[in-house]
Amino acid sequence: MFCAQQINIPPELPDLLKQFTKAAIRTQPHDVLQWSAAYFNALSRGEPLPVKERVEMPVATQKTDTGLTPGLLKILHKQLSSYQSVQPYELEQKWKDLCLPMEQLRSILALDNFGMEVEWIKFFALGCSTLGGSIRSALKHACEILTEDPEGGPARIPFETFTYLYLYLAEIDGEITVSQTESVLNTLQEEVDRQNGMVQPRNFMDALCPPLS
């Protein structure tokens, strides 16, 4: 039997457990054990943690309820955006760590002809499309996830990034013409020039902006 004096409690343990508990409450993982293993593995490696910034309600989209939410996609972006491309097994592991259904990952990957590597920014765009249903909604989600503005702010992102995402999603859609995308981008350019090269959802959701799709 051990007495209280013989039990050595690491001084950092209480704070570590406190932060872990807060993270679990914010993230609300479906599989606590799976998520906990991913949390402490990332913590030990000094990698971005699989933790939401705040509690959020699950999002049911027009297409299907994938279980993916803006908060979870933002976690994936923090974890994987430093790589231009990721191996499918790496993406699969991060997806599992967030307790998301594998069949939905496969359905997203099937939207493009990804090979042995997955270009992250393209997967991110498809994830936003899954969240939003329409291209306009997808790009709004992209702005809100990528922006450095505080929550509730204008959600600005570089126009170059917006253009890449828009043209890629238009290509995947297959029914949006080049003249249509050019009309949208040319219309937005005037606003972008006044905003130091940045675009925000208000610009492309305005009635004066041509339809994105």
Named regions from a protein language model:
Residues 1-213:
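Phospho-regulatory, low-complexity terminal regions
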